[in-house]
Amino acid sequence: MGRVAGIDEAGRGPMLGPMVVAIVVCPEEKVPLLRNMGVRDSKALSPRRRLLLSRAIPSVGCSVKVRVVEPQEIDCAVRGECYENLNHLEAAVFAQLINEVLSEGELEVVYMDSPDPVPSRFEERVRALLKGQVRIVAENGADEKYTIVGAASIVAKETRDEIINALKKTYGDFGSGYPSDPRTLRFAEEWVRKHGEPPPIARKEWATWKRLR
């Protein structure tokens, strides 16, 4: 049996902070160990359990790679300057991580959580950027269906949480960073009122920031 991989992102929708993409690569025979450990979609886990699992995933013989996508790069994609759109940016990051794994050896299959409601379209974007051959399974909700994608979602979410906690030490408690969070909105309003513009960690192309300017 060969190596299999799962890839997922965390933080696509917030108005503050980066998006994090993680890929977890395991020998196929190790995937049941992840399942037995309780690995599943990060959204179904408590913060404490997610932290413990993120540390345990490498201990069973799986490797992890992470890419942090900063707000400036996200804004550039949303404007259609660096990429066609945010999905195109995400496909490029997925492909970058898969190519890194392929450079280290053969990979049987990569399972990915598609941000595009048409997964085949997202798969084609990723495949066009690959430098080697690998079977791709792209599905909506893959983090709930495939243990290996659940592992990637855990690593991505935990990595992003660590970054957000560090940012809060600099900027203060801005809540979850999502536009639906009253604490985040209050932070945004107070920051713009005081500084006249969004903070450096803002995704300035988000509608909420445009409304506040």
Curated annotation (Swiss-Prot):
Disulphide bond pairs: none
Highest taxon in the source lineage: Archaea
Entry note: cofactor: Manganese or magnesium. Binds 1 divalent metal ion per monomer in the absence of substrate. May bind a second metal ion after substrate binding.
Subcellular location: Cytoplasm
Alphabetical list of CDD domains matching this protein: RNase_HII_archaea_like
Binding site for a divalent metal cation: 8-9, 113
Cellular component annotations (GO), alphabetically ordered: cytoplasm; ribonuclease H2 complex
EC numbers, comma separated: 3.1.26.4
InterPro entries in the record: RNase_H2_suA (IPR004649), RNase_HII/HIII (IPR001352), RNase_HII/HIII_dom (IPR024567), RNase_HII_arc (IPR020787), RNase_HII_hlx-loop-hlx_cap_dom (IPR023160), RNaseH-like_sf (IPR012337), RNaseH_sf (IPR036397)
Swiss-Prot/TrEMBL keywords: Cytoplasm, Endonuclease, Hydrolase, Manganese, Metal-binding, Nuclease
Main localization of the protein described in the UniProt heading: cytoplasm
GO terms, biological process: DNA replication, removal of RNA primer; mismatch repair
UniProt feature coiled coil, ranges: none
Named cofactor requirement(s): Mn(2+); Mg(2+)
Any Pfam family matching the protein: RNase_HII
SUPFAM superfamilies found in the cross-reference section: Ribonuclease H-like
Sequence ranges assigned to domain RNase H type-2 in this UniProt record: 2-213
Protein role: Endonuclease that specifically degrades the RNA of RNA-DNA hybrids.
Name of protein: Ribonuclease HII
Record gene name: rnhB
